[in-house]
Design a protein with these regions (language model features):
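N-terminal small-residue-enriched
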Residues: 2-95
Length: 95
């Protein structure tokens, strides 16, 4: 596969992390799953900056976000596969 655009830390993760300057809408992105050294691709729906997350699957309100194989928050507004995952649609479960 070509250069990596998105890293997925654990095979159970439902988000990946952008590792290039930015992803543009409708960009075909190359993903690398670190845990098992597998590759896959996804098409972005939005512009997503470096270090931000992208949904690897459709996520519904109330779903748990998994990163590093761990619960990092809950979906507060439905997110489609390929969309930007950030504070506008995910909140912590801590408060």
């Amino acid at each position: 596969m070509a250069d990596t655009d998105i890293i997925i830390h654990d095979e159970k993760d439902n988000v990946g992390v952008v590792v290039i300057e930015k992803i543009t809408p409708n960009q075909d992105c190359n993903c690398w799953i670190m845990e098992n050294d597998k590759s896959l691709s996804i098409q972005s729906k939005n512009e997503i900056p470096l270090g931000h997350k992208i949904a690897m699957v459709d996520l519904n309100e109330g779903d748990t976000i998994l990163k590093y194989g761990h619960d990092i928050g809950k979906v507060v507004k439905s997110i489609k596969k390929g969309e930007h995952v950030h504070v506008h649609n995910v909140k912590t479960k801590k408060w």
